[in-house]
Amino acid sequence: MMENSTTEARNEATMHLDEMTVEEALITMNKEDQQVPLAVQKAIPQLTKVIKKTIAQYKKGGRLIYIGAGTSGRLGVLDAAECVPTFNTDPHEIIGIIAGGQHAMTMAVEGAEDHKKLAEEDLKNIDLTSKDVVIGIAASGKTPYVIGGLTFANTIGATTVSISCNEHAVISEIAQYPVEVKVGPEVLTGSTRLKSGTAQKLILNMISTITMVGVGKVYDNLMIDVKATNQKLIDRSVRIIQEICAITYDEAMALYQVSEHDVKVATVMGMCGISKEEATRRLLNNGDIVKRAIRDRQP
């Protein structure tokens, strides 16, 4: 149990925040924010274990599920939503659950975070399985909703991860893979949407991005599995094909159209000079990983 919560402590550097000029306040806030990536850096050993396990479970058909309340919950929903266009994931593969439901994304839902049972019900509603990875996010490390979610996930046999911004957090005792990032007291006392929220966003960026790299949705540093939902992303898709295959934009567009807007298939077609059907077969035989499919010379 936590005896002292640093996320609720007063920050000595901002005791006179209300007396600072705008520029002084900005300089102070920026200086405090600079501590965040350094704090996250210290958690890389733990995050490495989390991501390796997440990759393994994802390859087995498991899902990545974020669960949290308030700012923590919103950040989980945001990261999950961004994975759909970025990595062409199914909306049901990476899920963000927030206490109080979708209404809580824009409005405070009073008391939602205080109910452990509510998290259990939310996880039951998505048919949680032992293959899934549940990441409980709570700056304080003691949010009842997150405690309830992680506890229930453990009973199902799911992989459980906790992300908190306090040492000796309650959720760290529940999760199989605890991650604690000490960002120190907030600029505005107790406002964990600030440094704590920034740390959580950086961590979720790492988890989702590196996991997707690990399951073959990235070629070099390109979004090879991008889902083109607008003109900007269509253009990006074509330029990715153009870049990898070293061809003209028009040639890349032709491949993109023949492949029925599948960047992976189009890339293998262009690199190997083969048909859509053959490119699809090679990807299927090589775990949907483009570099392996390109190297595959089997008839």
From Swiss-Prot:
Q: Which residues form the active site?
A: E82, E113
Instruction: Reply yes or no: does the keyword Lyase apply.
Output: yes
InterPro entries found in the cross-reference section? Etherase_MurQ, Glucokinase_regulatory_CS, MURQ/GCKR, Reg_chr_condens, SIS_dom, SIS_dom_sf
Q: What is its EC number?
A: 4.2.1.126
* Keyword Lyase belongs to the record: yes
Catalyzed reaction equations: N-acetyl-D-muramate 6-phosphate + H2O = N-acetyl-D-glucosamine 6-phosphate + (R)-lactate
Keywords of the record, alphabetical order, are: Carbohydrate metabolism, Lyase
The extra comment attached to this record reads: A lyase-type mechanism (elimination/hydration) is suggested for the cleavage of the lactyl ether bond of MurNAc 6-phosphate, with the formation of an alpha,beta-unsaturated aldehyde intermediate with (E)-stereochemistry, followed by the syn addition of water to give product.
* Family to which this protein belongs: Belongs to the GCKR-like family. MurNAc-6-P etherase subfamily.
This protein's name? N-acetylmuramic acid 6-phosphate etherase
